[in-house]
Amino acid sequence: FLDMGMFPVFPGLAEPPSNSRPKICILSSGYMLGRAHDVYKKLIEDKYEATVVDVWKVKPLDLQHFSRTVAPYDILVTLEEQTLSGGFGSAICELITDGSLKKSVLRIGLPEKYIFENGNREHLLNTNGLSVEEIYEKIVKFHRCQK
């Protein structure tokens, strides 16, 4: 969005979720915010309680601010366009552990493998498990396991 001159504001963060189903908070930054927002719209259409948080500063992470932000949510989903080991999702998991927060975490990112394929960003993300539909399906499957 930022590369298109838009600064998105995602609804839901300021309002505590209301029902007893596990609530979903998608944490992302940069380019993947667009995909996070598209997934968010699908989740809302299908009656899931969800929000998207732009973690615009990945490091250092502030435990107090983070704790307040994610307090109403049961499931945290980290969405990144790099490999999972040592990435954004790992930093979030460390913060959750260090703060003794009780949250279920689903990390979504690129697989830990060499990608020997050429193409633009959209093509490479879509062919490596980061299409909007695949992200949505991973979240819904994880959500079902948390009930």
Predicted regions mapped to residue ranges:
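Thiamine diphosphate
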Residues: F1-K147
